[in-house]
Design a protein with these regions (language model features):
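ASCE RecA-like P-loop NTPase motor cores
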Residues: 1-178
Length: 178
């Protein structure tokens, strides 16, 4: 039913605007937390980084950042659920012979995957850390951009699995490889 589909699309649109607004607020809270951690440090031409560890999560102000993220994460979960409902509705249309929706389904699937990955990485940084990852917040030299980062602690098994075991030949070039 087209009316039901429109309702789902409107709900997802409203939720996406809510995620956007809450994300902006989250980064404002995070920016204030970072500013407090940088207190007294001179400006630099280099990016500034704060490693997020258990001790970081006990610092004053972190609770506010974490509560703000909880709102973002909850709303993002609702949005992902709405997008999944739309994806299923598009699947029903495709099954009924409307081939024109297949591109939209592919785009929506990719969007949902990327949003899910971003939510999982951000939740790990905020309050569900993995022992296999390292987390940090980075501020660019001019201080106008914050980025959340996560990276594996042990890359050897990943390189072995995805490169050495999968490829017949591998050429790696880097200024840091010796």
């Amino acid at each position: 039913d087209f009316g039901l589909f429109q309702q789902k699309a409107k709900r997802a649109t409203d939720q996406s605007f809510r995620v956007e607004q809450l994300s902006k607020e989250f980064f404002l809270y995070l920016g204030e937390f970072i500013k407090a951690q940088r207190e007294g440090q001179p400006p630099s031409n280099y990016s500034w980084q704060l490693r997020i560890m258990a001790a970081t999560r006990t610092l004053p102000g972190w609770d506010d950042v974490e509560m703000m993220w909880a709102q973002v994460g909850e709303t993002m979960a609702l949005l992902l659920k709405s997008l999944d409902e739309i994806y299923k509705a598009l699947g029903e249309l495709a099954a009924d012979g409307h081939d024109s929706v297949e591109d939209s389904m592919g785009n929506l699937s990719n969007l949902m995957r990327r949003m899910g990955e971003a939510e999982a990485a951000s939740s790990g940084l905020m309050h569900k850390p993995s022992n296999e990852l390292i987390y940090w917040v980075e501020v660019n030299p001019r201080g106008e951009r914050l980025s959340l980062n996560a990276a594996p602690l042990r890359v050897g098994p990943l390189v072995q699995k995805h490169l050495w075991n999968e490829k017949a030949a591998v050429i790696m070039a880097s200024a840091t490889l010796t």
